[in-house]
Amino acid sequence: MSSHYEASIRKPLIEGDKSYHDITVDIARPIETPPNKDWWIAFSIAVIAFLWGVGCVIYTIGTGIGSWGLNKTVGWAWDITNFVWWVGIAHAGTLISAVLLLFRQKWRMGINRSAEAMTIFAVIQAGLFPIIHMGRPWLAYWMFPLPNQFGSLWVNFNSPLLWDIFAISTYLTVSLVFWWTGLLPDLAMIRDRAVKPFQKKIYSLVSFGWTGRAKDWQRFEEVSLVLAGLATPLVLSVHSIVSMDFATSIIPGWHTTIFPPYFVAGAIFSGFAMVQTLLIIMRKVSRLESYITLQHIELMNIIIMITGSIVGCAYITELFIAWYSGAEYEQYAFLNRATGPYWWAYFFMMTCNVVSPQIMWFKKLRTSIIVSFIISIVVNI
């Protein structure tokens, strides 16, 4: 009787027994062919949402940031909550690409492009809120430590707003370089298939002369690993800095040291849910069912379930520390959340963030496209 262990054969990450040529044709099809009906529907919804957002920004700048609910007693309103939300969903892209690359998880290859692109646009969106929050966005450059003609006027390095500027700009730079580096082979592939001279010229510029030589691939892997090593601690540090916006205040219920790990776990949680939402839509719109498989969706759901449990543990820890502290103001802050006028929002949050991901314990549910899409939307809410 043999005593050694034989691992079972893993399921292929790409379905359909496709050749390299088949993969190239399928991946290039959305660029080389006219958009289908599903794409136009998704694009129309995105354009409507974009125009709505532009209108809201113009109204806010014209009316004043008081329209967001900000006043002398309310310092955290529509702007900072949306800022944290966008930064949070931006973290999943770097985490999927960087951490899973370092751990040699091959299943990242089907979803990392979408996640990285989501990161870039989410970080840009997040950066808009501190700028608008200033009330005078045309003076946003004042947030940078630039030489000026106002004598001793300088940025306040003790301000969380300045911390956010450094965190967001650094994260955007590293994420952009990481995303572009990963795109080089794909851009070169589209360059070689391009027919129109203008398109060929553009793709030649953005692919940086990639030829596919062994030396190119060697440098590609080395740079990818270096960037992944830089981006991984960046994921942890950026949202820890964002959490300091709240943790450095003296308001009961907010002045707590649990915020950095709690915010990081929540960011990964919401970010993976947003990636799941986009992947399910994209696999349908772009006909990529063979590349974004049920195996990818199931693994994403497992991570959502784990991070949702971590967030739930953080909620319970907050309540316990408030009780254990014996500080009546701290206890009242948490008791008011659960029993005060906004009790319904508190329990709705607990249901969405803690209870709903637990159904992913059941394999039949976590491999269901409809259930996965609904849960990802619920978590994002």
Please place each PLM-identified region on the residue numbering:
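Generic start-of-chain signal for non-secretory N-termini
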Residues: 1-44
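Transmembrane-helix bundle segments that line or gate the permeation/cavity pathway
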Residues: 2-18, 58-69, 73-76, 83-214, ...
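Long, contiguous internal "core" modules enriched in hydrophobic/ aromatic residues
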Residues: 30-57, 152-349, 362
